[in-house]
């Protein structure tokens, strides 16, 4: 580490992990790893398709950053929906469920990694989400309210065409 001033930025952080992963690993490591890889392909694709970047993983957990909370929530909903569809077509022992935490906060940039309360809060929120669920911080939610107009609001804001 250098003595230079750390760079910080505002980021939408997505933290996700598999519910009951340790138990599944204890029951059948090879099957669990095979299923994790299949599910991670779904998760990783949704993150990438919505302009996110995975900056750390550990075992079954994934932490990603997004420039926009809208992209983060779209990615989370997309992969939860796709994991649910996968589970519907799998044997019970092949099913996995993720829980997701979302936060908007300042982070410190160190190489390709991010640190700080913005990341820590997302991880804490994730741990309180139910299986297949998505929890978000109040700050993240408030930002969504002001950046994602409802269909009704979009209709109101349309300008009439000039003749």
Q: What spans do the regions from the language model cover?
A:
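A short glycine-enriched loop-to-beta-strand structural element that forms part of the catalytic core
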Residues: 12, 94-108
């Amino acid at each position: 580490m250098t003595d230079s001033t750390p760079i910080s930025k505002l980021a939408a952080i997505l933290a996700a992990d598999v519910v009951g992963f340790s138990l599944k690993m204890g029951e059948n490591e090879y099957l669990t790893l095979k299923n994790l890889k299949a599910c991670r392909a779904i998760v990783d694709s949704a993150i990438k398709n919505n302009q996110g970047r995975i900056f750390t993983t550990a075992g079954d957990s994934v932490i990603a950053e997004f420039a926009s909370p809208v992209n983060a929530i779209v990615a989370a909903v997309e992969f939860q929906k796709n994991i649910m569809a996968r589970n519907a077509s799998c044997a019970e022992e092949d099913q996995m469920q993720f829980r997701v935490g979302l936060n908007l906060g300042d982070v410190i940039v160190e190489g390709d990694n991010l640190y700080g309360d913005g990341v820590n809060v997302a991880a804490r929120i994730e741990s309180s989400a139910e299986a297949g669920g998505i929890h978000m911080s109040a700050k993240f939610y408030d930002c969504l309210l002001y950046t994602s107009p409802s269909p009704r609001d979009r209709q109101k804001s349309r300008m009439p065409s000039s003749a």
